[in-house]
Amino acid sequence: KGDQLYIGLVGNVDLYSEDFDTHVAHLARDRRFVGVRARGSKPIDFSHDLVLANLNMLAQRKLTMDYLTNGGGIPGIQTADKLARSIPGLTIVIDHCLGYDFDGKEPDEDWISAVESLASNQNVYCKISGLYQRCTIQPAVQNLGHYRMVLDVLWKHFGAERLIYGSNWPCTKHSGSYASFLQLVDSWISPKGQAAREAYYWQNAAAAYRLPLK
């Protein structure tokens, strides 16, 4: 409270809680509370009536849901796709490049098709984060070529307006340095022009989380 070093915070609120809206309402008294990260002690069933009711409440409050598909592969993407279609008013930010395991190989066509379907939902954003953590080689490869094919698929389908920069700090320092990660992603986005850089680094986040930035 009173700390102006951050302008937005995504919180943890149990999606299975009967008091979900009460907790969210309390947190939302601080306008820097911008949404909820879908996580918990057990896997979340996004077809569960209470979970869906709580996410509808989140949408009505114009708050965002962060979603982790880590390890979920194509089924995880399809779950997010179905959710985005069932609650079109809910803004969803999917973290860590949709949970892709970066092995340096060309992504599978089935994965690309799942991404294309997901990205057709205009209420879904993709966060370019966690590259080092999701690299199958550790310490992580610090060469853009290892990641480019996947990043290019995300760019093709989400476009300049729905990709968001994420540092994943401090986790990044366990697999590589923050400086090298920033240099890597900047070498990917910079050739697309300054407008794309501005969108990627802050404007898209401002839109997704409704931040007071101009």
Where are the model-predicted features located?
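Mid-domain alpha/beta scaffold segments of enzyme catalytic cores
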Residues: 1-61, 67, 86, 145, ...
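Conserved, mostly hydrophobic/aromatic
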Residues: 9, 27, 58, 96, ...
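Short beta-strand segments
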Residues: 10-14, 127-130, 164-166, 201-202
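Active-site metal-binding loops of divalent metal-dependent hydrolases
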Residues: 13, 40, 97, 168-169
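Short, surface-exposed amphipathic charged segments that create phosphate/polyanion-binding patches used
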Residues: 22-27, 107-110, 214
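Catalytic pocket-lining loop regions of alpha/beta-barrel enzymes
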Residues: 34, 45-164
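Short Gly/Pro-enriched loop/turn and capping motifs at secondary-structure junctions
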Residues: 131-133, 169-172
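Mid-to-C-terminal alpha-helical segments outside catalytic/metal-binding sites
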Residues: 152-153, 157-164, 173-214
